[in-house]
Amino acid sequence: MDALLQTIIFDRSDMKNLTEDNPMSKTSLCFNKRQEELLQLKTSIVNQKKLYCDGNDFYILQPEIRLIEKLPKGNELVRFFKDNMLKKLGYENLSVANIKSLLNELAVDSEIHIENAVFEKNMEYVNFRNGVLDINTGNFTAEVDGYFDYVLDCNYCTVDYQHSFPNSLLKLLKEPMDLENINSVSEKDKSKVILVLEAIGYILADSQQERKAIFFIGPTASGKSTLAKFIASIITPKSMVKKYTLTQMAEGFSSMSAVRAKLNYADELDVSSKKSLQLFKLMVSGGELTLPQKYAEDRDVPIRAKLLFCCNELPDLHNLQAEAIMDRMLLIGFKNSVKKRDSTLAASLYEQRDLIVSMAFDAYMETKKKRKFTDSKFAQDLFKIYSVEQNSNKNFVNDCLKLATDGKIASSKLFDEYNSYCQANGISKPLSRHSLYQEILTKFAGCAEQKKIRDPNTGRSVQGFTGIAFKDDEGESIYGQ
């Protein structure tokens, strides 16, 4: 006899059926009847071939869209099971205790057992509502074996469409905004739209080949968040989209769900710590993240999530390994800041989602062939500025200082001259005092930082450096300030 039938707990309605003249007989009849009903219920659920279990988690199958979705645990699972399965079978009044017993039996039923590998498709396949696209070959088919744990909420356009950009996307991206001539697209606009389409395709695919994090950069009310939310809305179920910061993930907060999602998007890139910086590089590389388990060995989890950031400007990368981060960034600028937001734009994007996403994957497949994203002057200019700022301390030391055995310079004088140097060279974000002083000590082996030196200009005892001098030999500001 099934363990399920040995653990049946009577509903209160069963007790009402007892009579004074033959209570045990009535109880036995109720018990046998409930046994038969629960056996029939279990058989009905198994025969539906929609509920599966890997021994730990339950999954619900939607075969028409090849989606097998992981179900919640605990009381949420009981509630889902009751509302979405038992109600359709006429058992919505089954007690919670009996539902849990039924789930325990189903969890070990070999007929609904499923291995994770069965529904984890190759990264080169993309699941649309109307079929599956192979992004390596461009082949699209409505018939495919196996299942996915997500489906894009759109159809792939299998017929030839005119290669004119969707109006909703042009409205968002044209520079400057020119709604009366929305179809008049400059080469600059065309290049930007293609880059955005490539980025959308890359985000929605599972492939990590390009190893990039996407950055939408621009002022408030420029449309970057609208586009990010549109991309997120294409991914279903919604549990496949997360909004954790790198700091939250680095601290172990929901790390498992974050790395296994399809998309994680946040407002800013927070790489202020070495731990979050390492996590950023690891997640973009598409490797594996080792997560500690409370009562088991640590688990290596493949990283799947694409990272998308919506920023007003690039984060402060000073004092970090900026070069190691920059080559992992795909920057897209949003310059159209509007005074009044267009409340219809999000709906327009969603209405044109079939065309936008189809064009996005066509653009991304071209990117895979040429092994690079479309060049962006916006990104090139931004990286050039960052490179100059990142090396401003080195350039100042090389251009303005020299080794001098008897030389003495006050620390405050050095930093003032460095700031003047940055201002004269158009550097808006000078580095810190610590960065400057460390570069000086690294450059000049005979130089030393002293708590007290005699300032050659004022005669006062101040903190400063010995063994160096300004190249002008005068001790005055080299900019005449």
What spans do the regions from the language model cover?
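Feature primarily recognizes SF3-like P-loop helicase cores of small DNA viruses
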Residues: 2-56, 84-481
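TRNA-binding/sensing appendages of the translation machinery
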Residues: 54-91
